[in-house]
Amino acid sequence: MNLSIFLFLIGILGFILNRKNIILMIIAIEIMLLAVTLLVLISSFGFDDNVGQTFSLYIISIAGAESVIGLSILVAFYRLFLVLNYL
């Protein structure tokens, strides 16, 4: 549980400190989502519940789809403006 909280705080810190780099912001969001997934998995193993393990698979698949959408928007932004920093 402490590891997932630590990872979530690293993700928040990375999101706040890298406001000018969109790729690092997407990576920080992915770290936060994986920290939540780790917490769900730890809780499901602790309570002997298979629903939490299934829910963690959904979280991972949604996080993957979110990163694909974010990176495709980033590629479209780069093709229009030829720069990745938005400030």
Curated annotation (Swiss-Prot):
Domain of life: Eukaryota
Primary residence: mitochondrion
Disulfide bond residue pairs: none
Keywords, in A-Z order: Electron transport, Membrane, Mitochondrion, Mitochondrion inner membrane, NAD, Respiratory chain, Translocase, Transmembrane, Transmembrane helix, Transport, Ubiquinone
Complexes and interactors: Core subunit of respiratory chain NADH dehydrogenase (Complex I) which is composed of 45 different subunits.
Residues making up the signal peptide according to the UniProt record: none
Name recorded for this polypeptide: NADH-ubiquinone oxidoreductase chain 4L
One GO cellular component, as annotated: mitochondrial inner membrane
Positions of transmembrane segments: 1-21, 22-42, 57-77
A molecular-function term among this protein's GO annotations: NADH dehydrogenase (ubiquinone) activity
UniProt KW Membrane keyword: yes
UniProt similarity note: Belongs to the complex I subunit 4L family.
Any single Pfam family the record assigns to this protein: Oxidored_q2
Function: Core subunit of the mitochondrial membrane respiratory chain NADH dehydrogenase (Complex I) which catalyzes electron transfer from NADH through the respiratory chain, using ubiquinone as an electron acceptor.
Locations listed in the record: Mitochondrion inner membrane
Encoding gene (name): ND4L
One record GO biological process: ATP synthesis coupled electron transport
UniProt-listed Enzyme Commission number(s): 7.1.1.2
Membrane topology: Multi-pass membrane protein
